[in-house]
């Protein structure tokens, strides 16, 4: 009997599927670039055929195949002229794969009817109900439905002393880690938990996320990033958000301390220089000091089981490697079209090749330093949610200023939202009246890097999510 993976491979390699899917891919990605002048005539899409294929492909364990299935269903739901029965079928496939986030987002954007399941066959609804039930957990009397990867993590954590997780960034690691943490607090007696982050820049953000999650779950616990034991240490549940250096400080000051759970985020960095060596040392020390559970989380690590070398060999261990896809990412290559300085060729890097989509036209770009801001601004064509990565803080400020000039040249009467004006007042008061951020905010632009006050960084992120800030230029921190 042919396996699901073999069947999926046969489908995606068939000439008919490749031709039909390529037409869909070009049309779908091109529609997301407003300024694109398309050079493709995708013709009519065989939606019934592609959605039927997607229903089979979602059973594959191959990440690249899952990406194809997800693209088909996402494109169907986003296609404005497509009859509702096709959209409902695509949503049903998402539901069967427990991808509830995709459904929720589609409904919130009015791309999908909230009651889509009422139009599905009875057997499909029975299968969806069984899947939702089997992937559900109860956390503090509230039911949460997990995707396949999250459910595997949750179950493995219950059955083992240590687990090592490797999955793409979009798989939902942060969500399941927070629920593991909160459920552990509920089930254990005043547990002591360490959540290790790789850099100081992440400490406050993770601490705030944990505080908010516990508050939303109505769970009482002391959450701190200060390497000093709180006064009620023995009488309360405690969560410490540390770097390895802060954990080392606590271990040196309290040689008899025991912890119950250690979560190591970005655990693959254990192989990085001297800080990785220190992390390995403190983890090994904690593992020999008592009966502590460990969770290692990494983005697509080739050998997540290697992290178990840092803890006691007697631990019951399990590694979890997943290629689960919950979102699509389009890698677009933009290059000069011949000698022209105003015409830019746009290609999609997918299916192990460059796929020609079309071109965009900009004003004449004579300076290399203006290439990123001009292309980003023209390609976005006024849409919000534009995130630009640069190498350093000074470059983030420079690109933001250039974007501001482009926006105000096109829209001289631009007025920022009330929330942005309030942020401008806060920056003037808490940082400096002449801080460059103030001027770029007036055009709906912001920059973001690690060495900024947390309150300002958080508000920038919130305004970007709301659409009050159209362009956010940031560094990796």
Where are these regions (language model features)?
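N-terminal accessory nucleic-acid engagement/regulatory domains that precede
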Residues: 1-130, 381
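Conserved C-terminal RecA-like helicase domain
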Residues: 125-136, 149, 155, 164, ...
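N-terminal pre-P-loop "Q-motif" helix
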Residues: 142-159
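Walker A/P-loop
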Residues: 145, 160-180
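Motif I (Walker A/P-loop) of helicase-class P-loop NTPases
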Residues: 149, 173-182, 275-282
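Structural recognition of the conserved hydrophobic beta-strand(s) that form the central parallel beta-sheet
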Residues: 195-196, 240-243, 263, 292-299, ...
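Conserved interdomain linker/interface between the two RecA-like ATPase lobes of SF2 helicase motors
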Residues: 231, 284, 291-402, 446
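SF2 helicase catalytic motif II
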Residues: 244-247, 252-294
